[in-house]
C-alpha cells in the first residue's frame, strides 16, 4: 500500500504517501527515477518540494522545504519558474477552500466525544479520499466535484 494515515496535532486524520522503508523514496518512484503516476499525481506531488506558509486564513506563500526530498543530485529551479505551472490560480483557490474547511473541522473537534471524532474523521476520509473522483478527466472537473462534495459535507455538518 502506498498510503498511510497521519493524525495531525489537531486530531484530523489525513492520508499521506508512504515512503519506502529501504531508502525513503516515494513508493510511486520507478527505478528510472520517474513517477509512476505522473499524469494523475496529486497536487501536493506537483508542487513538491514546495510547502505553504500561511500568512492568515486565506493568504499563503510558497516556500522551499529543504531536506524533504531524499533524491540525490537535484536540479536547481527558481521558485518563480516552478510556480509557472498551468492552473496555479485554480489550485491556490482550491487550497484556500480546503484549508478553510480543515480549520472549521479543527474548531469543531474539542466539543466532540472520542467516538464522534472517529466518526467525523471516517466520514471526511470517505468523502474526500476513499471515494474516487471518476469522470474527472481534468483539473476543472476535479475542482467542480470537490466543490460539490465540500458543499454537501459543510451542509451535513452545519459548517455553512
Q: Where are the predicted features?
A:
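Short, small-residue-biased leader/transition segments that mark boundaries at the very start
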Residues: 2-7
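Short loop/turn segments that flank or connect secondary-structure elements
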Residues: 8-160
